[in-house]
Amino acid sequence: MKNEFSIKFNFPDGILGFEEIKEFIIKDSEYKPFSIMQSINGEINFLVTSPFNFLEKYLPNIEEKDWLDVQAENEDEKVILCIINMHVKTYKEITANLKAPIILNKKKLIGKQAISTNEEHYLRYRVFKE
């Protein structure tokens, strides 16, 4: 059995489309730099990664209220992830949702899906394309 790193986060508001799911585990994936964000019951899985892995100058313009909702006041508590989509037809196009990032307080283990107010961010930003 391989070692697997995972952390449980509480999402008081759930995430968009899955508001009823309040707890997710974020765990390592064998496909770096991606991680898996999985509901506690294991029924819902998302592939996630830091947007800074592919977009060095990502500026999401997240509202201060959103950071307060996850009780993150200091920069060292804040983590931003984005949900990754692999398009089923070819699996060759990978996009990231930059418009609605997952924000986390890594110390208090609280998360939320926020909305970026930066007009340059799209729901389907091409991360990789063959």
From Swiss-Prot:
Subcellular location: Cytoplasm
Keyword Chloroplast belongs to the record: no
UniProt KW keywords: Bacterial flagellum biogenesis, Chaperone, Cytoplasm, Translation regulation
Tagged with keyword Ribonucleoprotein: no
Pfam hit, one: FliW
GO terms for cellular component: cytoplasm
GO BP annotations listed: bacterial-type flagellum assembly; regulation of translation
Family, as annotated: Belongs to the FliW family.
Function noted in UniProt: Acts as an anti-CsrA protein, binds CsrA and prevents it from repressing translation of its target genes, one of which is flagellin. Binds to flagellin and participates in the assembly of the flagellum.
Assembly notes: Interacts with translational regulator CsrA and flagellin(s).
NCBIfam families referenced in this protein's UniProt entry, alphabetically: PRK13285.1-1
The protein's name: Flagellar assembly factor FliW
Source species of the chain: Borrelia hermsii (strain HS1 / DAH)
Taxonomic lineage of the native organism: Bacteria, Pseudomonadati, Spirochaetota, Spirochaetia, Spirochaetales
